[in-house]
Amino acid sequence: MSDACCGTTTSLESEQPRSPIDAEALPVVVIGAGPVGLAAAAHLAERGLDFLVLEAGEQAGASIAQWGHVRVFSPWKYDIDAAARRLLEAHGWTAPDPEWLPTGAEIVSHYLAPLAKALGPNVRFRSKVTAISRLGYDRVRTNGRDQAPFLIRLDDGEEIRARAVIDASGTWTTPNVLGASGLPARGEDEVEIEHALPDVLGADREAYQGKHTLVVGAGHSAATTLLALAQLGDTEVTWAIRAGDAARAYGGGGADALPARGALGARLHALVTSGRVRLLTGFFTHAVEKAGERVRVTSLDGRDISVDRIIGATGFRPDHSIASELRLDLDPILGSTRALAPLIDPNQHSCGTVPPHGADELAHPEPGYYAIGVKSYGRAPTFLLATGYEQARSVAAALAGDWEAARDVQLDLPETGVCSSNLAEAQEQRIGLATGISGGLLATPLPLATVSSGGSCCG
């Protein structure tokens, strides 16, 4: 009788394909044509590496275009990658005023669209990636795996082979749920919830005019939306947060290092104080259910509120399902790499102390696969655009075999990145503030001193 029933390791490995394909001759595939994905492409181009950018949307910065009406807090001088700038200037591009605060639409039209054009036909739109694997290998098979090219499948069935994959697809399409337990609130899937930044004073005005809208969340996206809603006449606005007070959301007013951000918090505070915006603190959403033509939202403590519309500004989470056949080493809490998690975990330290990091911290057991940008941070709300740019530079250097450069990570963010907006607290601890949309899109370098590792800003 045979002593094996299910195949042995030897027989399993003997089935591996012997492909004549030279993976090193294939391009590096970059998933996503947002700021970090295009920055990665610019660094790859600068190093003479073949690349192909696959963007699911119709244009560069497709996610940013969805909040094109929003003006950001950090000026142009913090929002442009160095390699991207060099490439653009070589094509005759004139940089915007470095002190100007751009809108999302301006970031796309003045920076990302010209950058995609400069990168040429190597940037493809309407190319949604649905799966990544190794050619001829599922996740279990090992022998010869590292020499096999990556296989990228698109939603139309097309398959592309690559020597490496840089996943900069972001998290915009996977927002966090309203439910306080990490699961959708009871009934949440049956009601309409807006998770983007609606243009309530423009294209979406009719949907909110004269209605009662509930905004859930305590970040800058929530604040921006609340201020816009408050400008609509005959409109009732309610704001629900989990915290016991809104101090973090208000910020430091006129003392803020970024005046536009400070003004945002001060205006929101005034609206709450005046009663124009009703604030519900300690509100942990448990149930969402239709109540006639309205929606009833119930907190864990039994409080409820009936509204016409809900805007969930609760942040985003990564979706790693497209890489389910790759060997990933994900932190069980954050969903970042296990090596990166201790550096960014908001439960452990102030996000202002996140150290520079690059290819080594972003690496998985699957050689040649890197997730960069906001997706690399998992659920940590501490990502900054400048961090993503340095990730792109480091990973491109690693793929070029220049490990000295890859490991010489020099992030120009001295003690920056507190993910709350409580400037008074930040100043007391001598740390800077991070701000932005969709996981800290924007960079805000501030010259500040060191904070102890025991501090916490983002819990």
PLM region spans:
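A Rossmann-like FAD-binding core segment of flavoenzymes
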Residues: 127, 131, 230-332, 397, ...
